[in-house]
Amino acid sequence: MAFDFKKEYKEFYLPKAKPALVTVPPMNYLAVRGKGDPNEENGAYQQAIGLLYGVAYTIKMSKKGDHRIEGYFDYVVPPLEGFWQQEGTDATDAIDYAHKEQFVWVSVIRLPDFVTKADFAWAVQEAAAKKKQDFSAVEFLTVEEGLCVQCMHIGPYDREPETVAAMD
């Protein structure tokens, strides 16, 4: 059975409806940085998602090709995640949802630990060759968040501030 990050790391991927502390260890990601309204049709955010999944599935399906990744095991591609901020603010400032065009984001998909920077570079080149598309915006990113507060937000994005306030 394929390794499923959501099931194996429930504390990170299935947060409770009430705020809770969690220590997030260093993790490697595929990442694309951008700016703008994520709801814009064919906008930068939509394009970033396509790039991320293109490389993510190239790595996952490497088992069927000539490129062998040491330590590879079958897995479910982890969910899309993101780090959001608004232009001209810092991480502690509230987001103004009326101005989504000012969003600055880093969209990410977690990588299994067996994926090296060399495997990542191969996957970017392979995806570009197969899809006839530029994947140079995709980067290998290591993030160590450390001690965090998390809470499942249920509802429209415009009501997210209520969930964030509950974590204060």
Write out the residue ranges for each language-model feature.
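A solvent-exposed interaction/effector surface
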Residues: 1-168
